[in-house]
Amino acid sequence: MVSVIEAHNTQWSELHRAQHPNILSLSQYLILPIDVRKREKSSARHNSSERGRQLSIAMQPLTRLIPRFAIDSGSASISRSLRISPRPSLKSSICLQCRIYSPSLRRHFADDQRPIIEPPPHLRPKVTPPEDPKPQPQPEEEKPASIPEYSKQDDSPSPQLERDRELPSTLESRRLAMTKKLSHLMDHMQGNIFIASQRINDLTGYSGIEALKNKITNLEAQVASSKELVRSTRLHYKTTVADRASSQREVTTLLARKDTWTPADLERFTHLYRMDHTNEQAVQEAATRLADAEREAEKAAGELSSSILSRYHEEQIWSDKIRRMSTWGTWGLMGVNVLLFLVFQFGFEPWRRRRLVAGFEEKVREALEQEKTLAMSTAIRGAEIGGGEGSEVSLDEIVAAEVQELKEEALVEGLGEPAVEAVAATIEGEVPHHESNNEPAQEIGEAAAAMDTAELNIPYSRPPPFDYRNIESWKEKMEAGKAAAIDLWSTRQVSITKKDITIIALEGAAGGAVLAGAIFTFIIRRS
């Protein structure tokens, strides 16, 4: 039947194929289900429903093709045998290939625009694939169109997830994770510390001493067990000796009255004689075990004594080595301190001093520029008004204010009146009355220099002697001590020579080294 169909397909004309481009040949319909099954096995899961639908569509013409072909063949053979030509009115105006397809099938391909079923690969013509038509709507449980929507939703960032990250529960879970991690680290910290201490012991040679300690502990247990064994063996030896002595006494008693023996006495003598032989062997074995136990105990005690002496010797050697290392470490620490002091004293301090001086000079320069600008503006305004004494009044006021401030400080600190007069005279003598208004900045600088010179030349007054009988003196002394203690932590600037700084730094380094060495030596001796 397949050969007949193939022969019939070869008779198709090119005009018939051009008129029916969407209709495949019958042989392709017969081969198509096999290829569809093969492609169903190798296709993805999401195309299985589509392939099944195409297979069902492809099988629909076959269900109508075979019966009609059989009926047509039978009618043709009957008409040829009876030589009855068909009526002209009943003859169809279309060809056999067009007649074998049902109207419903043509309506299915034409109206619904079903996707064209592709032929097998070996029969597929090399043409550009047409655009995919719109698929027929499927039931709700077989809709594959929802899968891309889910994928799009998965790919796009969800604002709900962003909001969930800021919820208290999410933050609490993160905090719990950090707490678990911290607890895990704390749990393993003890092991890490033990490993670090073991490495330090290996480097310093203390691991051998630890091994000696463990050996001494084992030997002590062995000596204790040996002593217990000697004690039990000696007790057993004494028991066997006492049993043999009692049996020998009874034998001696029986031998003393040998003439009056009865049969029972004879049996008793025989039993005692046999028992004496057994007791003699037991005494010999007990004596041997006692000697062996005493020998083992003495050996264990000797090993214990030698191990203790060896441990003491090794600890002395180790302590001497650690002491030497600590000495060299102390000297190294002192060298580092001295090096740091030299670096800070000759490298950092000059740089800091230059920086402070530069900043101070800049500020002084700015202050002088401002004062000069102010003096010039004052002179200009005085010239415009008609009085040229504005700048002189300003400079005199500045000098008077400085003198008054110096007097107040002298009164507070308890300076004598001659010192104040000397400072005032120095300032007043060094500050001349200027006649012109063109150099106010220079005059202010000279006045400041005169004030610095006067402050350096202030005589120091000796404090009055302390009165031990007056309570007020004690109160003043306590207040002064409290003020001095507070002043130690104040930000007051003081001037000191480099020699004093060097001495203080060296004293601090030496004191720290001595204290560290003493603490380390005390710890080593205690261990």
UniProtKB/Swiss-Prot annotation:
Q: Where in the cell is it found?
A: Mitochondrion inner membrane
Q: What is this protein called?
A: Sensitive to high expression protein 9 homolog, mitochondrial
Gene Ontology BP, a term: inner mitochondrial membrane organization
Record-stated family? Belongs to the SHE9 family.
List compositional bias (Pro residues) regions by residue number.
117-128
Coiled-coil region(s): 277-308
Its biological function? Required for the maintenance of the structure of the mitochondrial inner membrane. Involved in mitochondrial morphology. Causes growth arrest when highly overexpressed.
Cross-referenced InterPro entries, in alphabetical order? MDM33_fungi
List the membrane topology term(s).
Answer: Multi-pass membrane protein
Tell me which parts of the chain lie in the Mitochondrial intermembrane compartment.
349-502
Where's it mainly located? mitochondrion
Give the species this sequence originates from. Sclerotinia sclerotiorum (strain ATCC 18683 / 1980 / Ss-1)
Positions of region (Disordered): 109-171
Pfam families, A to Z: She9_MDM33 (PF05546)
Keywords in UniProt for this one?
Coiled coil, Membrane, Mitochondrion, Mitochondrion inner membrane, Transit peptide, Transmembrane, Transmembrane helix
Known partners and oligomeric status: Homooligomer.
Q: Which residues lie on this side of the membrane: Mitochondrial matrix?
A: 524-527
Q: What are the transmembrane regions? A: 328-348, 503-523
Q: Which GO terms describe its cellular component?
A: mitochondrial inner membrane
Q: Where is the composition biased (Basic and acidic residues)?
A: 129-144, 151-171
Source taxonomy: Eukaryota, Fungi, Dikarya, Ascomycota, Pezizomycotina
